[in-house]
Amino acid sequence: PASAVSASVAADLVARAVSERPSACAAHFVFANNRLLHAETPALPEGAVCVPIAEALASHPDLLRPHFLRHVDFLGGDKFAALHAASTLSGIFVHFPKGCVSTDPVIVHHFVGGDGAAVFPHTLVVAGEQASVSVFDLFESIDGDEETLIVGMTDLDADHGGRIQYAGLQDLSDKGAKHVQLQHTRAGRDAAVKVGFVNLGAEWVRNESINRMVDKGADCQIFSANLANDVQEYDQRTLQSHEAQHTTSDLLFKNALYDGSRTIFSGLIQVQPGSHHTDSYQTCRNLLGSDEAEANSMPGLEIDADQVKCSHGSTSGTISDEEIFYLRARGIPAEDARKMISLGFLHEAVEKLDGEPLQDFLFARVERKFAAIG
């Protein structure tokens, strides 16, 4: 459903991706319309596997098959998951075995273009015992206002003491592009997984994030910063499932909305029977930059265990006149003042991710989006 790009376009996309990548990297892959355009592994640790999904099916089937397309639970996105499973052609398999550690991220660019183009990238990350890996996905449009569709899936599996950080940036065209991202986490004993999403583009977005803490000491942190304007709609569904004693999780979603944009947040903390001594937190905060913007939040709790500490909540508000007055008194125009306050509002979520180069890259994209908002 997506045509290959020309050689000249491919060269331009690779040059763009390499020049814009946020930091030194363990590996870098560039896909356009499901085709692999570029691959390099300048600092991949010994023993690590980092290859396209299609290659992994042939070269590392024993490592891939226990994890690939194994999830059957979704938060309403079952039909998208079935479409993805039937159509996925691109994406990356990252496997860090026991004790394998890298401080540099694996960076994957996914470009889509051509009217009616659809791509189905899959990111599968496995961290063995005491391994540590970071992966950064970027989703971008090749051209302008074309009708395109991305249905992606991200699966994260951290074994005993494993560490995974996953960040996803969606910066597609806000005219015609639609993006669905279905993410699953399985955190084992004493494992730590950190997941971050930044949504800036696309006309319509559906994010589902299911995070399961399945053994003692597991921890998941989930963060999202979203900037919507015009008629963009961001639909976010989350599940924090505590399935063992002494597990922890923390979720922070922040949405800044302008014009007639709309966000939906539906999140659930679920503490399974016997999962005592759980600590879990869920917060969604919405900043409304116009009277027409609409933010809908539905946080929830289901607790079937004793001796737990859980909280959930959501707030929605506008920028106060006092804040604007304070900045205007210091020579800052009112519109610039509003953008500064909104930038600071979103920064709290972005800075939760590890790695200053990654934070700087994401925040620069947020600033670029603000500059484009009239």
Regions found by a protein language model. Give the residues of each.
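Short, Gly/Pro- and small/polar-rich lid/capping loops
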Residues: 1-34
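Conserved beta-strand/loop scaffold segments within soluble protein domains that form the structured core
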Residues: 39-49, 53-332, 346, 350-374
